[in-house]
Amino acid sequence: MRAMFKEIGIFIKEDLSNSIDNEALNSMINSLSNLDISLYLDESSNNKNKNFTILNHEEYVKKVDIVIVFGGDGTLLNAARKYLNYEIPILGINMGNVGFLTDISTENFEKTIKEVLEGSHKIEERNLVSAKFGNNNL
């Protein structure tokens, strides 16, 4: 498979709350591991999966072509804030309940990720809003 994205950053929800989530995550990570790509994890992540090369933040943002977020909309927003200044595309895999922003389901993961890696995708620019009330950031 010829991939447009070869250096894949992984961003995982801090606390996957049940074994079904962990089982789905492990299955998706195994699918990725079988492709001709490299998987990276930012050292600030709590997940230390053996399939990932762990990089410090500066190396990570220089190395990765795309970040795949495993979690819900909140996890995707956390990743967007963390990588805001680096122009790295972010792909959200919905492991939460809502999925407005992370609209790719775990059931469609394998088909979708192959299409994305082959270049069959469209990158959408999104805005991130910040607000301040008094001295408090919201």
Language-model features and meaning:
Residues 78, 83-96, 100:
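Gly/Ser-rich helix-loop-strand patches that form or flank binding pockets
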Residues 100-138:
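Catalytic core of DAGKc-family lipid kinases
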Residues 12-17, 97-103:
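Flexible, glycine/proline-enriched loop segments at strand-loop-helix junctions
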Residues 12, 95, 133-135:
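Short, structured patches in soluble enzyme cores that scaffold and shape functional sites
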Residues 1-3, 59-62, 84, 121-123, ...:
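Solvent-exposed alpha-helices and their adjacent loops that cap or buttress functional pockets
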